[in-house]
């Protein structure tokens, strides 16, 4: 069976960046991805989350279509809430080297337990 165009795009997903048009000032970029999914590494059941990214860019900004495809690439991947949130933080940091970054994984309740993971450059 031939892969559909969306599945092909997701399988080739790679984060990309663009030049920041306003490097002379600090400003916040808020991105929300409300349909994030990955697989629980213990059970294999899907985990659903809202991923929130807030950053102050330096020289680069993230290209949004590449971010969407990158985030969708986790849907069949077994990874914990903590690991995926930290991986997103690390990958975005490596790509953009922002002045400030916070990544939040706000996961839907499972077994009546809700998890929110927050990783930030601020201590």
Q: Positions of the model-derived regions?
A:
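N-terminal intrinsically disordered, cationic/polar leader segments
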Residues: 1-123
């Amino acid at each position: 069976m031939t892969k559909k165009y969306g599945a092909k795009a997701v399988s080739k997903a790679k984060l990309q960046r663009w030049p920041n048009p306003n490097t002379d000032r600090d400003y916040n970029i808020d991105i929300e991805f409300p349909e994030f999914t990955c697989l629980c590494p213990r059970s294999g059941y899907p985990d659903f989350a809202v991923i929130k990214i807030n950053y102050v860019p330096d020289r680069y900004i993230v290209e949004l279509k590449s971010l969407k495809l990158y985030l969708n690439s986790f849907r069949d991947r077994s990874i914990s809430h903590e690991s995926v949130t930290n991986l997103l933080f690390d990958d975005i940091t490596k790509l953009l080297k922002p002045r400030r970054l916070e990544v939040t994984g706000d996961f839907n309740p499972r077994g009546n337990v809700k998890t929110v993971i927050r990783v930030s450059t601020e201590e």
